[in-house]
């Protein structure tokens, strides 16, 4: 399952996010979206977890959790409209 994660601290690293989600199961990939021109974090990203039950557990436990002094917004990623 692909998980959308918002309100990520701009200094947070992908490996830190992976470690956080790994508490709930296997993480196959983590991507923090960056600005193309500056390379700076845009404050959101995606975590891919192969097991849907683990992903749901991570969403339930991490939505609203404080991570590097910011409250995460975590939910199932939805395909872009269009």
Locate the predicted segments by residue:
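Intrinsically disordered, low-complexity RNA-binding regions enriched in Gly/Arg/Ser/Tyr
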Residues: 1-42, 48-82
């Amino acid at each position: 399952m692909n998980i959308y994660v918002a309100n990520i601290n701009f200094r947070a690293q992908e490996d830190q996010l992976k470690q956080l989600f790994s508490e709930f199961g296997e993480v196959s990939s983590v991507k923090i979206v960056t600005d193309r021109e500056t390379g700076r974090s845009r404050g959101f990203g995606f975590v891919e977890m192969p097991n849907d039950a683990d992903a749901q557990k991570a969403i339930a436990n991490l939505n609203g959790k404080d991570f590097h002094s910011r409250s995460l917004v975590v939910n199932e990623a939805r395909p872009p409209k269009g």
